[in-house]
Structures are given as C-alpha cells and as structure tokens.
Regions:
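Hinge/beta->alpha junction and helix N-cap segments in small-molecule ligand-binding domains
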Residues: 40-49, 70-80, 138-144, 166-188, ...
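Flexible loop/hinge segments that line or gate small-molecule binding clefts
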Residues: 105-143, 260-268, 272
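Hydrophobic alpha-helical segments within soluble ligand-binding/sensing domains
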Residues: 136-163, 213-214, 279-296
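Amphipathic helical "hinge" segments at domain boundaries
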Residues: 20-80, 84
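Hinge/cleft segment of the Venus flytrap/periplasmic-binding protein
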Residues: 12, 16, 173-174, 190-193, ...
C-alpha cells in the first residue's frame, strides 16, 4: 500500500472512530499470563478460602486468555513469612499480583518493588491509597463498623454494657488495618448514640488454643453476668458462639462478620444474632478479572470498589448467594 493510500485509510478510520478489537487480539495471542495472589494462610472453610475460590473461578472463566494464578500464603503473626513470600513472587516476575496487606511498612516494601518492576497489583481487605494499587476490592471499613454498631444496638438498646471480642497478634495489634478501621467506625457510632453503654474488651489471643479461649470466656461471663450482647469485628464470632451453646447461655448472643460455615451454624442455633457478609468470593473473582481487563484487554478499571454491606440473620442465612457474580 502506498503512503498516500495508507494516509487515506487512517483518515477514514479516524472519522469512523475505529478502535482495534482488543478482545479478539487477546484471544489470538497464545501468550500465558501469570498472576500471583498473596494472602493469609487459612484453614478449610475460612473466609480467605472463599476469596481463593472466586479467583480460581475467574481463571476458569477467562481460560481462553491463558490466565494462571499461583497462591502464596503468609502467617498473620509472622511478618518474616510475608517478606519471604513476596520475595518469591518478585523473583517470579509475574504479570500481575493480588495481595492482602500485612503491616504497612512491610507492605510498602513489597509495593515499592512492584512499582519499580511495573507489576500492577490489586489490594483486598485493607485500602491503602498511598501505596497506589491498580484497584481495591473490599468494604468501606469505617462505614461497616458504624453499621455493625447500629445493627447491634437495635437489639441491645436497653443494655448498660456490651462486650467487644478481639483477637490480637501480640496483645495489642489486631490482624489487619481493616479491623482497626471497623473499630473506629463502631466506636464512633457508640459515642454519638449510646455514650453511656460500657464497652468491655475481651482479647482471645490469635495463637491461643480453644481451651484457653473458653477459659477466658468463662472468666469474662462470671465477672460480667449482665453482658447479654457481644460483637466481634472479625470472622471468628463462632469462637464465642460455640462457647455460648456449649455452656447453655441462651440469654447471650454475639454479632460478627463473614458467612463461613462455623458462623452460619451458630446463627442457625441462635448464639450469633447477625453476620455481616463481605462477599469474599466476589472480591476474589473481581480482583483477577480486573487484572485481565487492565493487562490483557487494555481496559480502564475502577480504582476503588466497595462491596455491599449485607446483614444475615437466622431468617435469611440459608439464602445467602455465596458464589453469585
């Protein structure tokens, strides 16, 4: 084609606002895309397993683009394991990363290296805008904690005291920034609307055994017999729920987060009043899909994606659509 003819073709394409079909081009490309996911080590039926299942489902749906995801796990109570795993990821030079942040300074070391290496990354769980992720998927933690307090006090409005159950890594710090922000929202609501309600904090240490947890719970309720409503801002409400059922404390309930099966059983049996669902499966699915759209299809992605806050109770817990996309 002559230069003059080429210019005429370009002019016509511009006039028609033609854009190349990125989808068709990507399908024609046989290149493999390797994504890595760094998340906390978790047990079966835990919240993070839901996230992982969603990511695997997205890879299955997007298999025509030769997308593969490798999972790396770190221990919440061992920051050196976070560093060890992210160094392995950097060594692999992946096309994209999905990560659940650890402590800010360690997380920043990882994200700084990814920026240097031009590796786009998605954040789950905690939104840290200063680290400049490609996108974030998760709840608005402050709003979620505020909402949790509001729901709790609908049934505890006449109480003089409530219990806040926490799980710390070292006697001070909880497992994630997300939980910190939820507590800020929770306490903000309580201060504004129920300033006279006493909030007792009970720490069930992250590394302790169930036997120790039950001893701590027994000691708490012997000391505070007037506590009838409890809340936790993590996915371990069943630690208290199971204890309440075992000790036949039918006049006490706890509220918590995440539709994991252990929590759901406590809801069905009445020891957990409400659960707030975070839609982990959807977070996992959309996080991988965002990498596909940005890296392979060359599409813009929405940087901040807050998940809906869904409340579950005994009446609707069995209708929760865990894997709906």
């Amino acid at each position: 084609m002559s230069k003059k003819a080429l210019e005429r073709v370009k002019a016509v394409l511009k006039e028609l606002k033609y854009e190349p079909n990125a989808y068709a081009s990507a399908l024609a490309n046989s290149r493999r895309y390797d994504f890595y996911c760094l998340m906390p080590k978790h047990e079966s039926e835990a919240y993070w397993e839901e996230v992982e299942q969603g990511q695997k489902k997205c890879c299955e749906i997007r298999r025509d683009f030769h997308v593969h995801v490798t999972f790396k796990y770190y221990k919440r109570n061992n920051l050196s394991s976070f560093k060890e795993q992210y160094e392995k990821i950097l060594e692999a030079k992946p096309d994209g990363v999905v990560m659940v942040p650890a402590k800010l300074d360690y997380t920043r070391q990882f994200t700084d290296q990814m920026h240097i290496m031009n590796i786009p990354f998605i954040m789950l769980d905690s939104y840290l805008p200063d680290l400049r992720p490609l996108a974030f998927y998760g709840q608005d933690s402050f709003a979620s904690g505020y909402f949790a307090a509001k729901m709790l006090m609908l049934i505890a409005h006449d109480e003089k005291e409530i219990m806040l159950m926490k799980q710390t890594l070292d006697g001070v710090n909880v497992a994630s920034k997300q939980q910190d922000n939820r507590e800020v929202g929770f306490r903000h609501y309580m201060k504004d609307h129920f300033p006279n309600v006493k909030i007792h904090v009970l720490d069930l240490p992250y590394q302790s055994t169930k036997k120790i947890h039950n001893q701590l719970l027994e000691g708490y309720f012997l000391k505070h017999p007037d506590t009838h409503h409890c809340i936790t801002l993590n996915s371990k409400a069943h630690l208290v729920g199971d204890f309440l059922l075992k000790t036949n404390r039918r006049n006490v309930q706890i509220m918590g987060y995440d539709m994991v099966e252990k929590n759901a059983n406590c809801v069905r049996n009445g020891s957990i009043s409400f659960l707030i669902a975070q839609h982990g499966y959807q977070q996992g699915y959309y996080s991988i899909d965002a990498l596909v759209r940005a890296i392979i299809l060359k599409k813009d992605v929405t940087p901040v994606n807050y998940m809906p806050i869904e409340i579950l109770s005994k009446e609707n817990v069995d209708f929760y659509r865990r894997t709906q996309i």
